[in-house]
């Protein structure tokens, strides 16, 4: 469809013709040739525009000179409703990841009629193994999680999204958290309501997300809703 106008977060959006109760909203997904986009960004940087915001300044100017087409996304081909979230804050990003774990999930990664294509590293399938303690009690388990390839978990993991090539050792607890790739959580460590970036090491017995004041004192970012963020390649000790 031909795009004839663009409004950046208007207070009263223009309704769809013939459907006064609905408006078309940009999902923030744009496709350009690299040369065209670079030229437009340079033109904006060298020009006299009052700002450099994509929605406020760059896209409206392009629209005045070039034809722009829009794709009306509505979950076509699947029984699921369309899914869109603004993940511009830590808490919004966290909630969107937790949507993957719902029953039913807000966004179903396993819907064959609506495939989600992403990077697939060459690792073996994830392995969740329960190693018994000397007492005979299990030292781990799994409930309502997503594990990416190459991950090995022998600890307790609940309500979490785990990236590829991670390790959760026996006796460790990971709960309501997001682990990026190559994260290690040592034996007896605890990670609760946290986002751990790539390559983070949580040493045996260490804690993340259990005491927010302690997290802040260590320099970790804690969101408004209490989600602790640990930066890439950080080592978290006791």
Residue ranges of predicted features:
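Conserved core of the sugar-phosphate nucleotidyltransferase
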Residues: 1-35
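Left-handed beta-helix
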Residues: 12, 35-238
